[in-house]
């Protein structure tokens, strides 16, 4: 219980929506706990520190999944010593120092890989608990902050990854990845499908087209899935691509086994009401799917965290990787045509999923903050440190 005024500073990043969604889930949960003495502030560190350069980097990051895969692969799989020498380790340093001086937080929570935090924790005993929520299923060096108080990770295998690189096991908690609480609540699947003019007795294949950032080839995929999966219907989420939505509606407007949607706030309901999902393996998307126990097909995952997530889910029996649309269609047909494998995958997910990650993490954060004291050392040392590095 927080009985004195305390402040949590959340450092996040807007590279993709996942990190922001995790942050919002935690903020909402803490707000729901009605803690009068707790204030929570969040900052998109890189965007605030270097808005123009970060905007360029974000565009490159998004396009790297389509056009610069080898370049991103080289960055992601670089040796740790190369990352240590990269300017990225110091990116946002001045802004971070100023935030700590201004806000004087009692706890820092990272929901985005923030190597610059390591610069502070390695140079100073800042006496501020630092906790990290890791939003992927395999460890990458950028998630490690020396002298951290806590790491919240998705699985016991992820914890072992941390232990293998020398992290104290007592600092790593297997909590699952925090998602919106609505993914934990029951859904009347039959009624949802009926309300959307779909047949609850058919197997529903959910396709998230917006996740792929492309607008071609989905008409053929839908046609082939329906041709090879006799008892299937397809729900296509087009995201913000109005062109894709228009073209698919025109092609399938008379087909009662196809529903074309644009951007939707009802992914929870669709995941809960579908038997199989074709998507990209972003950490939050697949965690939401995991919570709803919907097996997934990962179409041509990009090297890096996407591929690592997909490999883990395939290894655990939660999903399958398809390198091409044709391979994805074959997998759909195999899983939906009376194959027990789909039922077994769902059963495995039911057994392995971790519930209520957000609540678990928030309770532990409150415990950490209850034992923290207002730091003093950093406020004397940081101004000199800032002048040394930033000028």
Swiss-Prot record:
Q: In which pathway does it act?
A: Glycolipid metabolism; diglucosyl-diacylglycerol biosynthesis
List the subcellular locations.
Cell membrane
Q: Which one GO biological process term can you cite for this protein?
A: enterobacterial common antigen biosynthetic process
Query: Mind telling me which GO cellular component terms the entry cites?
Result: plasma membrane
Which parts of the chain are coiled coil? Answer: none
Q: Which reaction does it catalyse?
A: a 1,2-diacyl-3-O-(beta-D-glucopyranosyl)-sn-glycerol + UDP-alpha-D-glucose = a 1,2-diacyl-3-O-(beta-D-Glc-(1->6)-beta-D-Glc)-sn-glycerol + UDP + H(+); a 1,2-diacyl-sn-glycerol + UDP-alpha-D-glucose = a 1,2-diacyl-3-O-(beta-D-glucopyranosyl)-sn-glycerol + UDP + H(+)
- EC assignment: 2.4.1.315
Q: Which UniProt keywords apply?
A: Carbohydrate metabolism, Cell membrane, Glycosyltransferase, Lipid biosynthesis, Lipid metabolism, Membrane, Transferase
Alphabetically, the GO molecular function entries are: 1,2-diacylglycerol 3-glucosyltransferase activity
| Role noted for this protein | Processive glucosyltransferase involved in the biosynthesis of both the bilayer- and non-bilayer-forming membrane glucolipids. Is able to successively transfer two glucosyl residues to diacylglycerol (DAG), thereby catalyzing the formation of beta-monoglucosyl-DAG (3-O-(beta-D-glucopyranosyl)-1,2-diacyl-sn-glycerol) and beta-diglucosyl-DAG (3-O-(beta-D-glucopyranosyl-beta-(1->6)-D-glucopyranosyl)-1,2-diacyl-sn-glycerol). Beta-diglucosyl-DAG is the predominant glycolipid found in Bacillales and is also used as a membrane anchor for lipoteichoic acid (LTA).
Cite the HAMAP family for this sequence. Answer: Diacylglyc_glucosyltr (MF_01280)
The record's comment on protein family reads:
Belongs to the glycosyltransferase 28 family. UgtP subfamily.
Give the protein's recorded name.
Answer: Processive diacylglycerol beta-glucosyltransferase
The opening ranks of the lineage are: Bacteria, Bacillati, Bacillota, Bacilli, Bacillales
